[in-house]
Amino acid sequence: FENKVAEKQKLFQADNGLPVXLK
């Protein structure tokens, strides 16, 4: 569970200005 949360947080951080969710 923690691993998935960390991954989602990383995705959010990467989405600082790039459409990672769309990638």
Swiss-Prot record:
InterPro entries: COX7a (IPR039297), Cyt_c_oxidase_su7a_sf (IPR036539). It is a single-pass membrane protein. It is found in: Mitochondrion inner membrane. GO terms for molecular function: oxidoreductase activity. The keyword Chloroplast does not apply. Pathway: Energy metabolism; oxidative phosphorylation. It comes from the Eukaryota. Its main location: mitochondrion. GO terms for biological process: mitochondrial electron transport, cytochrome c to oxygen; mitochondrial respirasome assembly. Pfam families: COX7a. Keywords: Membrane, Mitochondrion, Mitochondrion inner membrane, Oxidoreductase, Transmembrane, Transmembrane helix. Gene3D superfamilies: Cytochrome c oxidase, subunit VIIa. Component of the mitochondrial respiratory complex IV (CIV, also named cytochrome c oxidase complex), the last enzyme in the mitochondrial electron transport chain which drives oxidative phosphorylation. The CIV complex is the component of the respiratory chain that catalyzes the reduction of oxygen to water. Acts as an assembly factor that specifically drives the homodimerization of CIV complexes, mediating the formation of mitochondrial respiratory supercomplexes (respirasomes) containing two CIV: supercomplxes with two molecules of CIV show improved activity. Belongs to the cytochrome c oxidase VIIa family. Component of the complex IV (CIV, cytochrome c oxidase), a multisubunit enzyme composed of 14 subunits. The complex is composed of a catalytic core of 3 subunits MT-CO1, MT-CO2 and MT-CO3, encoded in the mitochondrial DNA, and 11 supernumerary subunits COX4I1 (or COX4I2), COX5A, COX5B, COX6A2 (or COX6A1), COX6B1 (or COX6B2), COX6C, COX7A1 (or COX7A2), COX7B, COX7C, COX8B and NDUFA4, which are encoded in the nuclear genome. This is Cytochrome c oxidase subunit 7A1, mitochondrial. The gene is COX7A1.
